[in-house]
């Protein structure tokens, strides 16, 4: 897993270049948002169970067919697996927020997930919607925690939804 700094260094090192103005601005932005990133992670960690529970409730309110007989979250085991997966997405999104890099999502969450879900018959659409709902809830929680700028929170959630979302082939 790389963070924003190591990713930037790697890119410039591979090119054999010194940091230019863009690199310096990128580093400056990352470090300026560092305290807020850590505060966001702290707030998410303190409320993780509630965030996952709210996400599940809202998702199942919007898509009740998921918890009806024959639905992918029908039975206690499947329902629990859905909440477990939402918890994974939240945890890894938090890592990505702190790192300022989406590498951890590629390495630990997204590689092979679409194929795994497809092979198990897990619908991708509700998963994507759940991640979007989670982003909304996280941003509300962070606003309530007094973290004024939460724009950096969008990136990992949007990245996961984009990567998992249906793709035209």
UniProtKB/Swiss-Prot annotation:
InterPro entries associated with the record: Allophycocyanin_b (IPR006245), Globin-like_sf (IPR009050), Phycobilisome_asu/bsu (IPR012128), Phycobilisome_asu/bsu_sf (IPR038719)
Keyword Mitochondrion among UniProt keywords: no
GO biological process, one term: photosynthesis
Keywords annotated in UniProt: Antenna complex, Bile pigment, Chromophore, Electron transport, Membrane, Methylation, Photosynthesis, Phycobilisome, Thylakoid, Transport
Chief localisation class: membrane
Residues annotated for (2R,3E)-phycocyanobilin binding in this entry: 82
Source species, domain of life: Bacteria
Residues that bear N4-methylasparagine: 72
CC per GO annotation: phycobilisome; plasma membrane-derived thylakoid membrane
Post-translational modification: Contains one covalently linked bilin chromophore.
Subcellular locations according to the entry: Cellular thylakoid membrane
Cystine connections: none
Signal sequence interval, chain numbering: none
Membrane topology per record: Peripheral membrane protein
Annotated function: Light-harvesting photosynthetic bile pigment-protein from the phycobiliprotein complex. This is a protein functionally equivalent to, but with weaker absorbance than, allophycocyanin beta chain.
Family: Belongs to the phycobiliprotein family.
Assembly and oligomerization: Heterodimer of an alpha and a beta chain.
Record-linked NCBIfam families: apcB (TIGR01337)
Protein's UniProt name: Phycobiliprotein beta chain
Source organism: Mastigocladus laminosus (Fischerella sp.)
């Amino acid at each position: 897993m790389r963070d924003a700094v190591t990713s930037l260094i790697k890119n410039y090192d591979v090119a054999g270049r010194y940091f230019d103005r863009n690199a310096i601005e990128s580093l400056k932005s990352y470090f300026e948002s560092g305290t807020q990133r850590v505060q966001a992670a702290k707030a998410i960690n303190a409320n993780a169970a509630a965030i996952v529970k709210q996400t599940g409730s809202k998702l199942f309110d919007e898509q009740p067919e998921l918890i009806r007989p024959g639905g992918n979250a029908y039975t206690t085991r499947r329902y629990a697996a859905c909440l477990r997966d939402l918890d994974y997405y939240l945890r890894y999104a938090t890592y990505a927020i702190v790192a300022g890099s989406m590498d951890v999502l590629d390495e630990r969450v997204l590689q092979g997930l679409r194929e795994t879900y497809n092979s198990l018959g897990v619908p991708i659409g509700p998963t994507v919607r759940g991640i979007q709902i989670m982003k909304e809830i996280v941003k509300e929680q962070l606003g309530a925690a007094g973290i004024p700028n939460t724009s950096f929170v969008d990136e990992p959630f949007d990245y996961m939804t984009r990567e998992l979302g249906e793709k035209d082939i």
